[in-house]
Amino acid sequence: ISKNFDKFSYDELKNYEYKGINVGKKSLTTISWIIRTSEILDHHREYLINSIKSCIKIIDFLENFDIKSFSGVLVFNGLTLPESIMYEWCNKNNINVATFESGWSIENEVALELNYSPSPQHLFTFDDRKLSEHENKKLKEYIEKKRISSTNFNSPTDKKIISIFGNVSWDTSQTVSSNVYESMYKWLDSLIPIINKNKDLLFVFRAHPGEYREIKKTWYGLEDWFRNNKSKIAENTICYSAKDTVDSYQIIENSELVLVYNSTIGIESIIFGTKALAAANTHYTKIGFIESFESATMYLENLEKTLFNKNFDLDVEKMNQASSYYFQLLSEVAYNFGEINQNLRFNEHTLVKKYQTSSFNIDRLDKTLISFLNRDPLEKKY
């Protein structure tokens, strides 16, 4: 590679395109995974340079490889390297391509999602319908199972509560979601003046438990941000770390308003009857049950107005819509393989030995693969 990237500025590297593909931007997602934070700065430029060089080699390889002779291409995730380059290149060349990754399961089982968009976005065709009594019961059971090992939330004051829920800042879903704010931390920074202005309210920060899970252990999480900024923030705040077992749903139930970045807590808050504002764009923010915004300015203006007017009311229709959306996401999109999954060490999995000879109650992919070859919908419900 003859190009001397050492002379490029950090911004030039971030926006560098090669043969119509923004390899600079696509590198950011994977670098975030390497450094375990969304805060990619100038001193990370060596990661960026090496990643761009790798992307160029992949694109040159694909141009000289007869991939058009294949009926379809399946790639993992679609947002991380090197698969994101393959995904983008196939789309640019009108090659049938889809992504796969672990999906959601209302049975809390191992599941596989197939999607024509990058699978971490979890985009699907939502049927805006009311759930049956049986479906509502299943959804309630799913949520209740998630809170079994939680400990009670006890507010230290009688002030009205505004809760703030973070996410795993460097997760692959963040790159495509962060188009209102540059990152989750920029959003948190912007909340400080509002917190200080509303001392009659208690602001409860809750770090995402995923920050503490072995496979997603975060080196700089919400708790670290809170500790580093504590001197700038008024005393009307408390923060629960990722390893704290406090019941997040109990926090929601005791809140007047929930502020989320892009986690599914946004959906669950509405289901529990608590109004929520989303600070990033994600798979559920354009459905209608949660408020989302095109810019940080619009977000902050709406938040201030909501707090000033105490506009915390929520329509039952939105609660029903959120429940319907969540149920469909959990049960009609991904394919369950729970019965043939065998857990190994460190979040690894394999198939049980008898998966080919014994009868298991799992979702089959025969028709799905035919749908893929015909470029038909890939969701389980089809």
Please give the residue ranges for each predicted region.
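Conserved N-terminal ligand/cofactor-binding loop architecture of enzyme catalytic domains
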Residues: 1-56, 102-146, 346, 355-358, ...
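Donor nucleotide-activated moiety binding/catalytic core segment of transferases
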Residues: 52-65, 178-179, 216-267, 271
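Conserved nucleotide-sugar donor-interacting segment of glycosyltransferase catalytic cores
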Residues: 58-112
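A donor-sugar binding/catalytic signature common to diverse glycosyltransferases
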Residues: 76-78, 82-87, 110, 243-291
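Catalytic or ion-translocation cores adjacent to nucleophile or general acid/base/metal-coordination motifs
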Residues: 96-120, 278-305
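Active-site-proximal loop/turn and secondary-structure-junction residues that shape catalytic pockets
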Residues: 103, 168-170, 209-211, 245, ...
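C-terminal amphipathic helix plus adjacent low-complexity
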Residues: 118-123, 128-159, 298-382
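Conserved catalytic-core segment of nucleotide-activated headgroup transferases in glycan assembly
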Residues: 141-228
